[in-house]
């Protein structure tokens, strides 16, 4: 009988030892899985978890939870400067851990608190697994989730079944995430959304610093704010200042206007947009775009400028116009009204190319109010085999089609008429050209008019005579196929020479120049500036100015 009792006692103790080993192994495995982010071995603390109070305590070594003290009613623990309250708990004193149930409340210092329905706390590794209706509060930040692991040793909280962080006006949600109570930085992964006032960010990866309220998005992301949409793969946005820094070829969309660049800086509070590196500004409504390596545009004032390989494209007509200058500026007047208009300034070294027209000048201004483009300082324009130049050229448009052109002071029009060096030429103080459906139909030359014009044989179009004419005013009418129909002149004097008998000094007007070596050859050639050769510049004429009145 004694031997049987001894055998029975040995078997019971053997079972207790086995169960204890299995429990310890299970807790060790849970701790390992709960902290997959730490590759190095976790240090452990010897500080014990202490039971402060419980209305009821019982211990059942042979019950459902062997090795646990079963606590009920106003349960209170302390550990390493933290406190834990709950309705009931299993206290594993040997393992230095607690499983808490009902109205779980955890507090660490004066800045961190956590509430949930159920929690496991391992005192040795200072790890808490909180489940169901979890609310973590740290300073001014609040994190909501249903599954959270809080690592006190590394001051990190992880959620992995959806969570929401609220920081003042900022609200962030995602599937997975982590929050550091030490640095107050948070990371969010998969299905990430951030709401801040009128701003809305969607991405798959976002890092957020609660101290600065700066969010860093990584990967394909969209930022929406007050009518502006940003597409980016790498950006920093500050919800406090409403500013964003965009990298990795980002795009800002503002209605029918877009800006794309390698690096963009967007200030939503004042509308400033700065771009660096292959920046492209597109105006879909007006069918034009501006490109440069350095570009600025303010969407509220409509002011912008471009430098470093600045390029303007206009595709409002059938063929695209390409224009380059060292710098370009755009000014918008009466913005957000029905009377809005813009001015574009390009300077210096302006070169433009379109298949049917090319131009060069030192500076250019386009005013959309009167649809006038003015070219200053040695302007030259080419159309097919015709060249026109003067001190200043103004071109007026109607629905993106040339309506009128004015050449002011030292006007010269030259047309190359055959394979040999024969040119139709007109020089005057001023020249006006009128267009119909984009084709020049009439030209008026005014003041000190001199002209050389070749007649052709109607049968074989061979040049037959040269007409030299001097007058004060002359009007030329052109056919739709650019042929001269008739000429009107007042008090003209002139001479007609057979082509074979033209004196050498009558082949060219005194102001004749043919600037084919300056003419842009294609859209890529506009970036190479070529000035006039020495001796071919326009004459410098002193203009008399009326003296200012003085009042003594």
PLM region descriptions:
Residues 1-40, 552:
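Bacterial Sec-dependent N-terminal signal peptides
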Residues 32-552:
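N-terminal amphipathic/hydrophobic interface segments
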